[in-house]
Amino acid sequence: MRRLFTQPQTVLTIAGSDSGGAAGLAADWKTFAALGAYGLGAITVVTAQNSQEVRQVQFVSPKMVVAQMEAVLEDYGAAAIKTGFIGSADTIRAIAECLSRWPEIPLVVDPVLVNHKGQAMFSPAVTEAYQQHLFPLATLITPNRHEAALLTGLPVTTREEMAAAAIQLHTFGPQHILIKGLQEGETMVDGWLDGDAVRARARARGNPSSSSRSSFHWLEGSRVETNNTHGSGDTLSAAAAVFLGQGLEMGVALRRAHEFVRGAIIAAADWQLGTGHGPVNPLFGFYNTDGGKHG
């Protein structure tokens, strides 16, 4: 019998379980599959949630999180790794210590720190653990504008403020920074600080601040009128991880990830799953928007 599929690359997500299937591991694995990758997972937290609320949270011990990571990395390996909801300073430190053994693997860190209203969910110790332990290992970090403000202490309400926050975040050690979710009228704006260009220009000019601002790029799209955006941040960071694992340059990976998550939002814009904040559809390439499978 002829084989129909080539062997996929493996991508590991270190994230939470969402019983509603919209965010966390569910969003990541759907995104990985849609883009041709095989998803591995290390669960950090189990949540009882739906489209309206999070009812209960049970954290997995740092030791068990690391055991999951080691089990898959030592056997399957990974073309890329991403982190999502962690929520514990001790677990962040344990994850960072484990990941330091695989510095060659691209690492995307999505620092989940605020709820959908932009309010901080955790103690300052969690923020500091990201800054001190995970960010220095990261190829890319993907905070939204509220998380960027929390991490830097700076306002992030304009493009200029977004660029300033990204420059501050770069001092914590990540190679690249993508800040998401600035709304300008009917346009949604994400900002990417190209860390490679920052370092190259700083060496050439000796002016890191000027070099940083000239290394900032914008990813824009018209706002989609929908309440179904739950899991969009996870989908974006998961897509970026897949593309980086394929060896794409950062700018190309981010633009493709940006296009992918926009497609996932549009495909689920009219869904009525639950009565609150509904999911996006990372599998839009496989299913029609009316729910019928292609083919």
Task: Put a short name on every predicted segment.
Residues A149-L150, N228-M250:
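Short, small-residue alpha-helix embedded
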Residues P8, F59, G251-G295:
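Charged C-terminal helix
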Residues R2-T13, T31-K117, L283-T289:
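Conserved N-terminal subdomain of the carbohydrate kinase-like
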Residues M162-H170, H217, E249-I265:
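Short, well-structured alpha-helical segments that form the helix of a local strand-helix-strand
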